[in-house]
Amino acid sequence: MSEKPTSIKLVVVGDGAVGKTCLLISYSIRKFPEDYIPTVFDNYVVSLTAGTRQIQLALWDTAGQEEYDQLRPLSYSSASIFLICFSVTSSVSYDNVITKWHPEVIHFAPKVPIILVGTKLDTRNDPAIVKRLTEQGMTVINTAKGEELKNRIKAVKYIECSAKTSENLKTVFDEAVKTVLMNKPQQRSKCALL
C-alpha cells in the first residue's frame, strides 16, 4: 500500500509586481509568463518527490495590492511555509518586507517558517534599470542587504532568483520543501499489530 503524499502549503506574499505570480508559474509549468496580470488569489499544485516521500506542494499566490489587505490573510490558514518576496531592483518592496509583510505574516502565522526571496535577479545588472534607479537616487539591492534583512526578520533562508531565466528558481522551492520536512514529524501508520 502506498503512503499518502505529504501536503505542504506554501504561501507567497510581497508587494504587487515583484514577480510572485511569475515565480509560481515559471516553477509549476516551467514557462515564464510574458504578460503581467495582477493576482487576486490563485493556487497551483505541484506533485514531487523528496527522497522517498511523495509531496503535494500547494502554491498559494496572493495579491500584494493594498485593496486586498483584509482578504489576503484568509489564505494564511494552515500554511506550512511563507515566501516573502521583494524585487532586487525595488527598494520600496524591500522596505515593505519590514513595514508590512513580515508583521502581517507573524501576526497571522507566528510559528510558520519564512524564506526571504529576492526576485528579478536577471534585472539587477540591466544597464537601463541601473540607470533609472540611479536617476531616482536609488540602487539595486545587493546580496549582503538581502542577508541582512533575512537576519532581521529571522527568516530561515535568503535566496535570490529569476523566474525569467530560472536561475535559482528550483532552489527556492527545494529549500522550502526541505525546511518544512525538517520541521514536520514523519507521519506514521495508524495500524498496530498486537
Swiss-Prot record:
Q: What is its EC number?
A: 3.6.5.2
Name its species: Entamoeba histolytica (strain ATCC 30459 / HM-1:IMSS / ABRM)
Q: State the taxonomy lineage.
A: Eukaryota, Amoebozoa, Evosea, Archamoebae, Mastigamoebida
Q: Name the NCBIfam families on file.
A: small_GTP
Known catalysed reaction(s)?
GTP + H2O = GDP + phosphate + H(+)
Gene this protein is translated from: RACC
Provide a GO biological process annotation.
regulation of cell shape
Q: Where are residues bearing Cysteine methyl ester located in the sequence?
A: C191
Name of the protein in its database record: Rho-related protein racC
- Enumerate the PANTHER family for this protein: RHO FAMILY GTPASE
Q: Where is the lipid attached (S-geranylgeranyl cysteine)?
A: C191
Required co-factors: Mg(2+)
The regulatory note on its activity is:
Regulated by guanine nucleotide exchange factors (GEFs) which promote the exchange of bound GDP for free GTP, GTPase activating proteins (GAPs) which increase the GTP hydrolysis activity, and GDP dissociation inhibitors which inhibit the dissociation of the nucleotide from the GTPase.
Q: In terms of domain of life, where is this protein from?
A: Eukaryota
- Write down the Pfam families for this protein, in alphabetical order: Ras (PF00071)
Bilayer topology = Lipid-anchor
What's written under domain? The switch 1 and switch 2 motifs undergo large conformational changes during GTP/GDP cycle and play important roles in the interaction with downstream effectors.
**Propeptide ranges, please?**
192-194
Instruction: State where Mg(2+) binds.
Output: T21, T39
Keyword annotations from UniProtKB, A to Z? Cell membrane, Cytoplasm, Cytoskeleton, GTP-binding, Hydrolase, Lipoprotein, Magnesium, Membrane, Metal-binding, Methylation, Nucleotide-binding, Prenylation
Transmembrane intervals? none
Q: What does this protein do?
A: Small GTPase which cycles between active GTP-bound and inactive GDP-bound states.
Please give one Gene Ontology molecular function term for this protein: metal ion binding
The record's note on quaternary structure and interaction partners says: Interacts (GTP-bound form) with PAK4 (via CRIB domain). Interacts (GTP-bound form) with PAK5 (via CRIB domain).
> Which InterPro entries does the UniProt entry name for this protein?
P-loop_NTPase, Small_GTP-bd, Small_GTPase, Small_GTPase_Rho
Residue sites binding GTP per the record:
A17, G19, K20, T21, C22, E34, Y36, T39, G64, K120, D122, A163, K164
Q: Does the keyword Cytoplasm apply?
A: yes
Major localization class: membrane
